[in-house]
Swiss-Prot record:
InterPro entries to which the protein is assigned, alphabetical: NTF2-like_dom_sf (IPR032710), SnoaL-like (IPR037401)
Organism: Penicillium crustosum
Protein name from the UniProt record: Terrestric acid biosynthesis cluster protein E
Function: Part of the tra gene cluster that produces terrestric acid. The clavatol biosynthesis cluster cla and the terrestric acid cluster tra are both involved in the production of peniphenones and penilactones. The non-reducing PKS claF is responsible for the formation of clavatol from successive condensations of 3 malonyl-CoA units, presumably with a simple acetyl-CoA starter unit, and 2 methylation steps. The esterase claE probably collaborates with claF by catalyzing the hydrolysis of ACP-bound acyl intermediates to free the ACP from stalled intermediates.
Pathway(s) this gene product operates in, as recorded in its UniProt entry: Secondary metabolite biosynthesis
Gene knockout outcome: Does not result in significant changes in sencondary metabolites production.
Pfam family, one: SnoaL_4
Domain of life: Eukaryota
Amino acid sequence: MAAPALPVSLTPALSDRDAIADALYRGVIAFDTADEVLFKSALTEDAVLVLNGTVMEGYDAIYSGCYVNIAKMDTNHFLTNMRVNITEESKAQVSCSALSQHYRGGEGMKPGSDFLLAGGLYAVELVKDAGDGLWKIKHWTLKTTWGQGDWAVFGK
């Protein structure tokens, strides 16, 4: 874990466009800080993650199939070129580019450690939660377009 993340709800209130982007930021920063509360705040209970063709359906499947493996690593995830399309009052789409660095847990600062640097594209559908007012990821497709380094750093 790097540094503690900011709280789930930020002040002052964000515009819808910023709040939509913040849902993605909450999701990826939660990996980097191993913040389960932040991660849970970013997704709906019935969210779907399609990671390079592997489908995980429901928050629990995403948590156990993705989050627990990545959160124990030394990582940084960066999102850029974000485009937000608000399709309805409580629905939106986002596309963006992602860059992520991965080291085995505790090895990020060790010179010569194996790593994987990956670039990819995200296509995300989001909804605004009527209960807490937060925008959340409903369907998240991640396609890795290139990788540099050792994929074995993901070894379980």
